[in-house]
Amino acid sequence: QSGMFLRDPFATRFEYTDFFHLATALGGTPKKALFIGLGGGSAPKAFWRDYPQLQIDVAEIDPEVIRVARKYFEVPDDPRLRLHAADGRLFLEGSRERYDLIVLDAFFADAVPFHLTTREFFALAAEHLQPDGVLAINAISAVEGPRSRFYRSLDRTLQERFPNRYTFPVWLGDRDPGRLRNLILLATRSRRVAVPDLIRSAATLGDRVHVAQLRDYAAGIWTAEVKTDDVPILTDDHAPVDDLLKLEGLQ
């Protein structure tokens, strides 16, 4: 699903995509970025506009999605924004690029491609990131309670390659930690950034990238300890994503 305002094709239709700019507040201005999943292209085209030196690759498994995004969602036809009809994991396996930012935006509420959630995939992503690069993931889950198992499994799986992880719930007016919502996970291998420093960086960045609320998004970071001893590490041999989604009531 996607959407666009006809009067302003770059205006945010779904708020969660603005949260991806927190990766810049965390890791600095990227020079190369990979988006896995295109949809209507809201996030890639915003990054294309807001970071004039940024080279963007997008791996989208469905060629028809690319065609529709170009025709109806005003995704720019520009050398800095390259669209590839490819599965995101296979694209990385065949690539020699190292990115400053990898954005994984290929999960639906009730359908998650399990091969993009596993220990092996995150190892591959880490190999294709610069040492101070950021992996950003859009997941739909809760941060606490019985509907949080998918999120907590992702966090446990990420731990092996990404010692520093930051979670930003898209609160949308309520602060119920047990409610299903978009969660933006940022994962890094570089030194941990203190929350006050992250908030200050987001406040400075917000005006530049046309996201006035970016400071507030940063301040909404989830800081409670994430309990992971009762959820599995996701692997290529065992990634019970469908079972986790069923437990959350998403299937």
Please provide the spans of the model-predicted regions.
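Soluble small-group transferase modules, centered on the S-adenosyl donor enzyme superfamily
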Residues: 1-3, 168-251
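Generic detection of intrinsically disordered/low-complexity segments and helix-coil linkers/edges
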Residues: 10, 66-67, 156, 211, ...
